Every structure is written in C-alpha cells, then in structure tokens.
Amino acid sequence: MAPRDKRLSSTPLEVLFFLNGWYYATYFLLELLIFLYKGLLLPYPTANLVLDVVMLLLYLGIEVIRLFFGTKGNLCQRKMPLGISVALTFPSAMMASYYLLLQTYVLRLEAIMNSILLFFCGSELLLEMLTLATFSSMDRI
C-alpha cells in the first residue's frame, strides 16, 4: 500500500477505463443490432450466428470484469486487481480480433469498431504496465 500522502494512481489510465466503459456499452448494443441485421438479411448460418452471439455475451463478461478490476486496482493503488486486469486484457484483445477477422461476415462498421477496441486494449495495457511498475517501485521505498 502506498503512503497516505503519495498518490500513485494514473489519471490517464482512469480516463481510458472510463471512455472504454462507455464505448464498450455502445459497441455491445450496436453489435447486437448488427447480428440482428445479419440474421435477417444475410444468409448467415444459424449455428454460426448463435456461436457469435454467445461469444459476444462472454466478451461482455470479460470486459466488464477487466474494467472493474482495472479501475479498482488503479484507484485503490493495489497491484493484484490491476494484474488481473492486465491478464484479462489478452482474452479481451483476442475476442476483438475474432470479431475483426474471423466472423462469417465482417461489416465495415464492425471492422472500425473492433479496431478502436484493440486500440483501447493496447493503450490500457501500456498504461497498466507503467502503473504497476510505479506501484512496485513505491513498495521498495
């Protein structure tokens, strides 16, 4: 734990978590509407559509947990929750990559939205690692 007079939380990281939370909520709703569009108007195999929607729900769970632990770890200046958030960044980036590259049909809007999600993941990972290094260096003092 950091001394009481020393604030080590990363403000840019917290801003990214906040923006990513709102962006992901919008992404999730748009992606559900896009799947509805694909299911109704495109010859989308039913099994693939069900799989993609189930994976989107799993992605929602991973992302909510990742953002929660990242925010709590940053604000409370704790390494463990921030480390959990770092570990969950990789499955989150893999899911964004799946929706960017491996779906049956990838619309241009989806490609743009998933690219933005990957940018958020990369930026947050970099800032989380720097914040973890800051927390660790203050433990030695």
UniProtKB/Swiss-Prot annotation:
Entry's transmembrane regions: 15-35, 49-69, 82-102, 115-135
Topology class, membrane: Multi-pass membrane protein
Keywords for the protein's UniProt record, in alphabetical order: Cell projection, Cilium biogenesis/degradation, Cytoplasm, Cytoskeleton, Membrane, Transmembrane, Transmembrane helix
Places the protein is found: Membrane; Cytoplasm, Cytoskeleton, Cilium basal body
Pfam families noted in UniProt: Transmemb_17
GO cellular component: ciliary transition zone; cilium; cytoplasm; cytoskeleton; membrane; MKS complex
GO BP term (any one): cilium assembly
Subunit structure: Part of the tectonic-like complex (also named B9 complex). Interacts with TMEM107.
Job description of the protein: Part of the tectonic-like complex which is required for tissue-specific ciliogenesis and may regulate ciliary membrane composition.
The protein's name: Transmembrane protein 216
Annotated source species: Mus musculus
